[in-house]
């Protein structure tokens, strides 16, 4: 997916936390969002920046920084952020939210993983499961 990312880089006041050399050589991440007004926000790597009104684009070294910055943006009621992985070849991959819905939200199409239709009190006795050959989550 060779998607072109657009937007202005936020204005930095002081330390930005910077990109690591590894981020340029191996891969880097980008987060994009749209802001209704210019406002100051905290960077996950330390420091602060001022986002522009309209589209914003910020390159970061790790996906976790993007997730943390998304948490900061939610304090400003900005929920339309997207995180991309950018490889040195220029290939851009959309990675968060992967299916268009944030993990903590309910999505009718999202399948349940390791779901058991029982309450905690109905769980089997661990001593009976231990040597039965079954995994505890399959019992």
UniProtKB/Swiss-Prot annotation:
Recorded family membership: Belongs to the PsaD family.
Lineage of producing organism: Bacteria, Bacillati, Cyanobacteriota, Cyanophyceae, Nostocales
Origin: domain of life: Bacteria
Function text: PsaD can form complexes with ferredoxin and ferredoxin-oxidoreductase in photosystem I (PS I) reaction center.
Pfam families named among the record's database cross-references: PsaD
Keyword annotations: Photosynthesis, Photosystem I
Annotated protein name in UniProt: Photosystem I reaction center subunit II
InterPro entries per record: PsaD (IPR003685), PsaD_sf (IPR036579)
Listed GO biological process terms: photosynthesis
GO cellular component term of the entry, any: photosystem I reaction center
Chain spans, region Disordered: 119-139
Originating organism: Trichormus variabilis (strain ATCC 29413 / PCC 7937) (Anabaena variabilis)
